[in-house]
Amino acid sequence: MAERMVPSPRHERLRQLLVEAEYRANEVRQAYQRASSAMRSGQVWTGPTAATWTTELEARHQRLGRLAQNVVDAVEEELRRSPPLVTEAEANAMRREMAGRT
């Protein structure tokens, strides 16, 4: 007789992690927009050093946004690989592993 299927604790945890990662990635994408806009306005700090600083700030901001998206993409990929339903024995093993009791 087939063992009863139950929701996967790992799948559920990955879903929660994805929500958090997407939220944080959105925060990161907006993190330096105010500073960048202020610098681009020409009313905060001007000159060659200011222009260089602004360019570096924007480059780092873009890189940070890409890295945050990489985290979201990795969690999504792992979620796709994780079945939403597993046997009770598998679910129990996952719970033990997630609790550090392997």
Model-derived regions, located:
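N-terminal secretion-targeting helices of virulence/extracellular proteins
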Residues: 1-102
